[in-house]
Amino acid sequence: MAQQTPLYEQHTLCGARMVDFHGWMMPLHYGSQLDEHHAVRTDAGMFDVSHMTIVDLHGSRTREFLRYLLANDVAKLTKTGKALYSGMLNASGGVIDDLIVYYFTEDFFRLVVNSATREKDLSWITQHAEPYAIDITVRDDLSLIAVQGPNAQEKAATLFTDQQRHAVEGMKPFFGVQAGDLFIATTGYTGEAGYEIAMPNEKAADFWRALVEAGVKPCGLGARDTLRLEAGMNLYGQEMDEGISPLAANMGWTIAWEPADRDFIGREALEMQREKGHEQLVGLVMTEKGVLRNELPVRFTDAQGNQQEGIITSGTFSPTLGYSIALARVPAGIGETAIVQIRNREMPVKVTKPVFVRNGKAVA
C-alpha cells in the first residue's frame, strides 16, 4: 500500500491526478502539466516534497564523519545554515544517492535525501556512522513544501511572521534557517529562485491552503520533471545510480579532491577513473519535430573516425523553449552534433552543455 504525505487530502481537493511514485501517492498534475510548468517559470508554483527524507545528525564527530561519507567536503561549511550538494558514493565510486547537507553547529548537521533511496541511504549512513557515535534522527514529523519561481519568495513571505521574514531577508542561495516552527531554505529543483520549507506535519495543510490563497499554483511530478530537466538537474536512477560514477553524471564539480589526504568512500575508484577516462553527460537539443525520449541511442563519430554510441538518460519536450531537449551519457570525444535514432528515423541533434534554462532564460 502506497504511503500518503500529510498533504494528500489537499491534493485531492485541488483536483490532482495521483500516482504511485516510489511507494508514495503523489500528484502527477492538477489538470495541466504545461500550465504548472509555465507558472514556475513566470510566477510561482509549489510542490509537495514531503516524501523526501530529512535526517538530522548529532554528535561531536559529525563533521569528521561526513567528510568520510560524502564526496564533497563539509569542511567548506563554516557559516551557520550553509548547504552543500554532494554524492554519497559506494567503494567503486557509484552513486548511492545525491543529497543536500546543511550545517548548523559542530554537532548538528542535516541531510535531505531522495525518497526512492530512503531505506538503502539510512542503512548505509547508519552502518558508517557507528564508529563516530553519531545520533541519527529521521524527521518523519516534518513535511516539506517547495515554492519555486520568480515571485515565489515574495508570495511565500506573506505567510511568514515578522521574525521569519527578518530571518530570510537577504539570504543567499543554498542556505537554510530555522525560524519559529519553519525551516526555510533557499534551495530547489527547478532552476528558479524559491524556498524549500519544512514544517511540522500538522501545520502543512493550513500552510498549503494559505499558499494557494496567496496565488501560488500547485504543481505535480510532471512539471517537476520538465523543470528540472530544463535546468540540467539530475534525477537519481536516470542520470546516476550505484553503477554510474559522478564523473559520468556531470557531478565532477561536487567531488572535493583537495585536500589530497582526505579519505572519502569511493575516492580510490574515482582517481582511477579520472586517470583512465570516463563517459560524460551532455545536453542534446533537437529543433526538428519529434521528442527525444529516455533510452534512445545517441551516435557520433569521434575525432579518430570511430563510431561511438551513448544513451539518452532523460528527454522531453521543453515547454519553455518550444523544442525537444535531453541529457545523454556518451563516451568522451563527442563533437558539436550527433544522431539520435527515433523509431526508423535518424535525427540530427546539437550537443550542448547539460543545462538549458536558468531563471526563465534559455542558456542552450
Swiss-Prot record:
Catalysed conversion reaction: N(6)-[(R)-S(8)-aminomethyldihydrolipoyl]-L-lysyl-[protein] + (6S)-5,6,7,8-tetrahydrofolate = N(6)-[(R)-dihydrolipoyl]-L-lysyl-[protein] + (6R)-5,10-methylene-5,6,7,8-tetrahydrofolate + NH4(+)
A Pfam family this chain is assigned to: GCV_T
Highest taxon listed in the record's lineage: Bacteria
Gene Ontology CC entries for this record: cytosol; glycine cleavage complex
UniProt keyword terms in alphabetical order: Aminotransferase, Transferase
Enzyme Commission number: 2.1.2.10
Coiled coil region boundaries: none
GO BP annotation list: glycine decarboxylation via glycine cleavage system
MF terms in GO: aminomethyltransferase activity; transaminase activity
Primary role: The glycine cleavage system catalyzes the degradation of glycine.
Family indicated by similarity: Belongs to the GcvT family.
Quaternary structure note: The glycine cleavage system is composed of four proteins: P, T, L and H.
The protein, known as: Aminomethyltransferase
